[in-house]
Amino acid sequence: LDLEKVYLDNFSSINDLNGNLIIKNNEIYMADISGDFDDINNLKFTVNTNDIGEKITTLFSSRAKPLVKRYKFIKGFEDSGEGYLDFYSSKKDGISKSKLIIDNFKVKEIPALAKLLSLASLQGIADLLTGEGIRFTDFEMNFTNQNKLIKIQELYAIGPAISILLEGYIEEDKLISLRGTLVPATTINRSIASIPLLGDLLIGKKVGDGVFGVSFKIKGPPKDLETTVNPIKTLTPRFITRTLE
C-alpha cells in the first residue's frame, strides 16, 4: 500500500499513507499502515493475529478530530489544540476487549447528559451543552463487545467543569443500562483538599464552594431512556484515584 494522499472528508487528508495489508476470508489478517496529517501529526494502524488466533488491533492518531467528526455531539478540537485518539483491541472467539482514549475535546447537545445535569440541579453546566460545550481533558473507556452487546467495565471523563465515572452495558437497538457518578470539579477539589498534606500540595488551603455530586442510573430503550439521580456525600477511592491519575 502506497498512496500519496487520502481524503478522510472535505477538510482532512492523510499524506504518504503506506504499509502492508493482508486479507484472509474477507477480514484483515495483518496490517501495518501509517501516514502523516502534516509535519507534526501522524496516524498509525496495525492488526496482528497471533498463533492462538487472537487478533490485536491498534489505532493511534495525534489528531482525533478527523476520526470522530461524524459523531456530531463531539466538538471543540479546533479551539485549543488538537486532541489525540488511542485505541487498542484484542479479539478472540468473537469477543473483543478494547480500550479507547480521547484527549481534550468538548461535547454538545447530548439529551441524556443534559437531563442528568438538570436532575442533579447543575443547570448552569447543562446550559453549556447548548452553548460552547462541556470540555473534557481526559476520556478513557474500557469495554468488551460480543455480537451486539457492549459491556462497559469503566468509562471515565475528567474535565474542568465536571467529571464522570460509569459502567454498564448497551444492547444494540434494544436496551441501555448505565450507572455511575457525576461530580462537579469544585467537589473533587474540596475532597482532595481534605487529604492531609496531599490536599495542600495539589489544591491549596482555600477551596471554592460547590455542591456534592450525584450517583445516577440511565436505563431503557435507546429512544425512551429513564434517568434517576441520588445525591452523594462522599467520593469513592476509585473516583479520586482516577481524578489524580
Where do the model's predicted regions map?
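Gram-negative outer-membrane assembly/targeting C-terminal domains
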Residues: 223-245
